[in-house]
Amino acid sequence: MAGSRTYRTKVLVLDKTKLKETDLILTMLDERGRQVRAVAKGARKPGGRLAARCELFCTVDMLLAHGRSLDVVSQAELMEAPLGAAPDYETTCAASAIAEVARVCSFEDAEDPFTFAITQRALALVGSGLDTAHMDLLVACLLYTSPSPRDA
């Protein structure tokens, strides 16, 4: 087999799906804007080496091994947790919406580095503690729209 079996990449964890008793399937956005799905073996164990490093909305430096249909997480190092250790409900809901948009807008075979950068920046803004009124205005500005007087 030619080439390397493993590769290192920086990813944002967008979604986690339970697999068996101790494993997770992670849906991630890599730094090239490509969607990556990988199995994190033992990530559901409380004392597992991947348990705290593969949390939702976190930026993680990962070493992945190519598998048959899914990659396998060999190593993970937490780089940034923009929402902090224990985010509140509103923050988690906002970050979840951002992650869902990123998941739907990214594909396994199409690269778009802008998707990674804008998702990472949006999660950082959500984690910075903006109140909901400012967040609504920020989203309106990003969408190039202005709120009409009727909406107020």
Where are the regions that the model predicts?
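A surface-exposed, charged beta-strand/loop segment in the N-terminal or early-internal portion
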Residues: 2-117
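A residue-level signal for conserved active-site and pocket-lining positions in enzyme catalytic cores
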Residues: 98, 141-143
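Anionic-ligand-binding alpha/beta catalytic cores of soluble enzymes and soluble regulatory domains
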Residues: 136
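Single conserved hydrophobic/aromatic residue that forms the stacking wall/gate
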Residues: 144-152
